[in-house]
Structure formats: C-alpha cells, structure tokens
C-alpha cells in the first residue's frame, strides 16, 4: 500500500490525531488500489455511526416516535450526507485509488467518498475507543443535529409518493430494475417507476437499487406536483 501524502493536514481537518497512521491510510484506500483496502473498516464505521447518531437522536428528541427517529437517522447517515461531509473534509484529495478509478474520476464519486468517511470512523474506533468516536462524530454532526427536526421532512421519496397516491386513492407505484452496470463492488442501477397519472416511466439511477428507486420516486413527485 503506497503512503498517502499530507495525512497530518487531514488529521487536523478531521479533528483527530492517529496513534497508528496506517489505519488512516487503509481507511482511504479503495479496493482498486490494494488488497489492504477499506471495506472492513467501512463495515465497522457504519455500525458505529448508526449507534452514535441513534443515541444522540434518542436523547435529543424524547417525545419523537420510533418512525421519526428512524427517518431522522436515515437522513443523517445516508450516503449523500456522508459524501457532503467527505467533500467538506476534501477527502477526494487523499484517496488511494487504482488507475482505473483514478482515470474515471473516482475521487469525486459519492459512493467512494461516503465509504471513506465510514472507514475513517472505523479506523478511529480501532485507534482509540467508542467514546472518542462519539465525541468526534458529534462534532462533525453538530450543525446537522441542531437543524434536524421530526416530521414529514424526514420521510423519503418512496414513502411520500406512496402516501400521496394513497391519499388520491390511486394505485401504488411500480418499480422495475432495467439495467445493472459495473463490478459487484461498485455497481450502478437503473430503475423505472410507473404511476397511472404519468404516461411514461420515470427513470432513476443510483449506486444501489434502493437509491435508484428513491431517485425515480423523487422525480415522479416533482412531475405530479407541477
């Protein structure tokens, strides 16, 4: 695994100094670049992020329902939110990518950026402990936690579309995967969404079937509200 430059600067940006800098190097390494890649750290970081944000929301909103808590958590930990955080940290400048990913602009790809954030969380946990992770994450999420509120704004596009159609006494939307491209670890899904009030199917594209369905549902809602 090639050493990554300027890691002390990244540590200052993250707000954490690693005792074992190799953990941070691994967290920034995509599987296209090395066998010592970040996917196991990503798995660990995903779980840690979920418990820290769940705990924060549970105590911040003592009267919120389970559904509202789940929707707020989903908003805060989903891939596009993590990708925004990655861009705030300029993680793309530090990623270790293979030649193919580098050439195709992998340092800008939201799924790779989001995965790197989760991997860094996992690396901090291994380098320190859960409480250190908690303190760090609450700092990263301070503004987002302050701004988030329970309610309809946290419902995802598929839920909003379903509720809209049910309220109009219309049939539920139908989703169909029409194309899957890419390697197993980095696929792109194309999904069509059909509703009775639109003559043509609406297409959504995403790094997972769920994300593609959400994208399609959001576009259907926009068309129905015109």
Swiss-Prot record:
Its EC number is 3.1.26.3. It is an enzyme of class 3 (hydrolase). Pfam families: dsrm (PF00035), Ribonucleas_3_3 (PF14622). Keywords: Cytoplasm, Endonuclease, Hydrolase, Magnesium, Metal-binding, mRNA processing, Nuclease, RNA-binding, rRNA processing, rRNA-binding, tRNA processing. GO terms for molecular function: double-stranded RNA binding; metal ion binding; ribonuclease III activity; rRNA binding. The keyword Glycoprotein does not apply. Mg(2+) binds at residues 42, 115, 118. Coiled coil: none annotated. Residues 7-129 form the RNase III domain. Its cofactor is Mg(2+). It is found in: Cytoplasm. The active site is at residues 46, 118. Homodimer. This is Ribonuclease 3.
């Amino acid at each position: 695994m090639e050493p990554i430059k300027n890691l002390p600067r990244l540590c200052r940006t993250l707000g954490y100094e690693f005792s074992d800098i190799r953990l941070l190097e691994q967290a920034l390494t995509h599987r296209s670049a090395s066998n010592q890649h970040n996917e196991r750290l990503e798995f660990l970081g995903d779980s840690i992020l979920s418990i820290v944000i769940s705990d924060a929301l549970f105590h911040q909103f003592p009267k919120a329902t389970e559904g509202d808590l789940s929707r707020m958590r989903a908003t805060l930990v989903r891939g596009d939110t993590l990708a925004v955080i990655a861009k705030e940290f300029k993680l793309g400048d530090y990623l270790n990518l293979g030649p193919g990913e580098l050439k195709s602009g992998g340092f800008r790809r939201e799924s790779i950026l989001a995965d790197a954030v989760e991997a860094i969380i996992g690396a901090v946990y291994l380098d320190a402990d859960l409480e250190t992770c908690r303190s760090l994450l609450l700092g990263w999420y301070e503004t987002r936690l302050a701004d988030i509120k329970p309610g309809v704004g946290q419902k995802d596009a598929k839920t909003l579309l379903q509720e809209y159609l049910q309220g109009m006494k219309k049939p539920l939307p139908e989703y169909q995967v029409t194309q899957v491209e890419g390697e197993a670890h980095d696929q792109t899904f194309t999904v069509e969404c059909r509703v009775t009030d639109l003559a043509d199917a609406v297409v959504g594209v995403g790094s997972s079937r769920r994300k593609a369905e959400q994208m399609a549902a959001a576009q259907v809602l926009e068309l129905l509200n015109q």
